[in-house]
Structures are given as C-alpha cells and as structure tokens.
Amino acid sequence: MIICKTPFRISLFGGGTDFPIWFNRNNGMTISFAINKYCYLSLRELPNLFPFKYRLRYFINETSTKITKIKHPCIKGILKKYHKSHNGLEIVHSSDIPGLSGLGSSSAFTISMLKLIHKYNKKNLSKDQLVRKCIDIEHNMLHESSGYQDQYACAYGGFNYINYNKNNIKVNKIKITKFNLENLISNSILVYSGIQRKSELIEKDKIRNINKNQENLQAILEISKEAKN
C-alpha cells in the first residue's frame, strides 16, 4: 500500500494576481503558508477476485470495470493518463478538513493523486514537476478556472512568497524567526464556518472581470510586495 499526504494552505496576500491571464501581461505575487491539516490518499493493487477493477472511496464509494467509466473526474483523468498497467486498484481518500472550504483542497487532492500514481509507477517527481503536472490536469484536462498559487503552495509546503511572470514562476521561502512564527500562530485563529462553496464559480467571475479590475489587482500586488517586506 502507498499512502501520500499533502497539506492544505492559507492564502494571505495576492489572490487574483496568480492567474495566467494577469501575470502573462503583468507581474504577480502571492503569500501563503501550508498548515498541519492534510489530504490523504492511499493506493493498493486490487486482487482480481472482484467483479470490478477499480474501487474508490471518497465521499461516496465507487466501483468500475474501466477507467473511462470512473465518475470522479480527477481520479479518472490521472489514471487515464498515467496508469498503464492492467492491474486493478483501490484508492481511498480521507481529509482533516471538509472539501469546498477555501483552503486549496482541490489542488491538494490532485497533488496527492499525482504523487500516488507516480510512486506506484516507481517514479519520483520534483516539486516543480508535481506542480506542472497538476496545472496540466486541472487546466487542460478538467478545464478548471483557477490561478496557480494553490498548486505551488500545496506541492512546496512551508511559508512562501511566489513571484509570477510570463517567463518564470519562482517560489521563495520566507525567512521568519521562531519568535515571529510563534507570534503569528498564537495570534491566528482558523474557524470552520460550515459554509462550503465551489471556488470555480468565483474564479470564473474573476477571470471574466479581470480587465475591469486592473487597478484593484495592481493595488493587491503592491500590498503583497509591502507585506513581503
């Protein structure tokens, strides 16, 4: 059995400047940190004693005889692209936090799934490779509308500021003293409101209005720079 975990993230500054439609014409910067709450995925080969080839357990239980008949879009997409053997698989998901909570759960799931299937294929991926494959799955296969900060924050972990431009994306570790880190933690409260929403609708609205909001996004970028300093 292979088990992978990926942290969720809290975004502090710069949201909206991590969209390609923005940073391909302007610069972008986000500041975020990973937290000690995780998305867990496990994978094991399924014995060929069952009337199905794939058994999935997430918020529902699902069985399927073919990858193309799997209902979960992310699992189906990743298996279709990277699972080349004929072995049956069981994949189980669990999480410290409910989905749709605004903490990067979608990207955390995709990153975990990519780590899982590549470990199964006996291949190691760098953090940058993980991010690029995650973006490819989410944007090109699942056609999701999202920025890039969640993929980087979940794959890299830690406390970082991320610079975006059309030629390069760079993750920079924020150097913070133990005292200041403990001060930040002791003065922060993470509360579950019970409200769940699909970020896809919010992100599509951001992209649709990005030309109208250029002044606001530029101001968000300047605030991010000030916060970094």
Segments predicted by a language model, with ranges:
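DPxDG-like acidic metal-binding loop motif
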Residues: 102-123
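Short, solvent-exposed loop/turn segments at secondary-structure boundaries
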Residues: 23, 67-68, 102-105
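C-terminal nucleotide
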Residues: 1-13, 18-21, 32-85, 117-123, ...
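Short pre-catalytic strand/loop immediately N-terminal to key active-site residues, enriched for Gly-Thr
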Residues: 89-101
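A short beta-loop-beta micro-motif enriched in histidine and acidic residues
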Residues: 26-28, 148
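Short clusters of hydrophobic/aromatic residues that line enzyme substrate/ligand-binding pockets
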Residues: 31, 97, 103, 162
